[in-house]
Amino acid sequence: MKLQLAAVATLAVLTSPAFGRVLPDGKYVKIPFTKKKNGDNGELSKRSNGHEKFVLANEQSFYSVELAIGTPSQNLTVLLDTGSADLWVPGKGNPYCGSVMDCDQYGVFDKTKSSTFKANKSSPFYAAYGDGTYAEGAFGQDKLKYNELDLSGLSFAVANESNSTFGVLGIGLSTLEVTYSGKVAIMDKRSYEYDNFPLFLKHSGAIDATAYSLFLNDESQSSGSILFGAVDHSKYEGQLYTIPLVNLYKSQGYQHPVAFDVTLQGLGLQTDKRNITLTTTKLPALLDSGTTLTYLPSQAVALLAKSLNASYSKTLGYYEYTCPSSDNKTSVAFDFGGFRINAPLSDFTMQTSVGTCVLAIIPQAGNATAILGDSFLRNAYVVYDLDNYEISLAQAKYGTGKENVEVIKSTVPSAIRAPSYNNTWSNYASATSGGNIFTTVRTFNGTSTATTTRSTTTKKTNSTTTAKSTHKSKRALQRAATNSASSIRSTLGLLLVPSLLILSVFFS
């Protein structure tokens, strides 16, 4: 989920078991999570206008943790999001609750029932996201715990009005905080940063470095983990490579990167018989756990579609092609400048209710930033280094046994700079064919990165109906928001129903 920059497509819930903890001797915080499939959320209601819908339902997911807030404590489930930086929770008395959506599923915070809540009336809160959801309220403080981890003193907002059924625990860079780059900060001409969750962990002594590693695990598995302040070497194979974040908003006065944008240096396709380089045009790409699917500039998607003999369907709004067989080993190769992350084509393929397949990589028009969501991220082990404005990546390794955790002190242990570390994106350009990304791949032993052997069974979508959203989205006036989500929203209908966001294409 990214503030105004990225459309979020979320459906299933990844919940955190009760054994996430701080390890005093190792100084890191481990938050395991489990996956809850979309079918567990119940049936969707019928659209008010009766139109049928084509729904991509199987891959939607988000990560959540349960927090205990106040005295006595009230339990709330919030989205864990790398694409934003603030913690906010739904407040009691939200006008959307009841008649429009069920607010009790993930909990609401009633500040009047907490004897320890302290409001900060001088710090209003407003956040708007690319999917049309928003939250409005004010900051405050209270007793706050995640399992045995005491977070009291961490500032959070209570949203008196929101069209989202759940709150958000943003763990992005502090420059994404609404107090720094949000609507209120801009209008009041007073911007400041505060210790959000990652910074709070560091400054409270729970971790040594403001960094965390993300392991989504294979889609067929029901668990994964996030380590704050550490790396688990058992969760990846080959070399862990480091690349710098790129500052897309330097011209707007930002001295440092605002979000987790990196340089995608090329895109390719690997089959049993050959390697195909699609483009070596440099593209800025956001690594965002709050976005389920992957979004690429329209020219790049067209090149990929052409290599698959896919044709664009105006009816569906997607590229359509013959469904690959269950034993198809084709993978999409993402080049980051001297190393690749490979992802099975099946992760970007969805089967329709009528038996055809579509390419579930969403094209974006104009000068658009690529968004590498969960369909990409589950194939990578990703370390977000907020202190050094860097990302470290390696091919994810599944089915590992014993953990091999190493604390991050100042830099990511065992990671080395990518061969093209300094060859970063600088200007928007249309993706064109040419080049060869397969001659530059390196690993610690000098061989090509191994393509993961994963199931390529195509995900199947459900033909279902859903309620029509009746709310107009509010827009945040962020300085960082040069890329709107309008191109995404013109391709997909993003509809908010109780606790669910559905990606859908309308049939006439």
Swiss-Prot record:
Protein origin, superkingdom: Eukaryota
Active-site residues (renumbered): 81, 288
Keywords: Aspartyl protease, Cell membrane, Cleavage on pair of basic residues, Glycoprotein, GPI-anchor, Hydrolase, Lipoprotein, Membrane, Protease, Signal, Zymogen
Region of interest: Disordered: 448-476
Propeptide stretch(es), residue numbers: 21-47, 484-508
Expression induction: Positively regulated in response to cell wall perturbation.
GO biological process terms held by the UniProt record: fungal-type cell wall organization; proteolysis
Lipid modification (GPI-anchor amidated asparagine), residues: 483
Single GO term (MF): aspartic-type endopeptidase activity
Summary of the function given for this chain in its UniProt record: Cleaves proteins C-terminally to mono- and paired-basic residues. Required for cell wall integrity.
Family: Belongs to the peptidase A1 family.
The protein's name in its UniProt record: Aspartic proteinase yapsin-3
Lineage: Eukaryota, Fungi, Dikarya, Ascomycota, Saccharomycotina
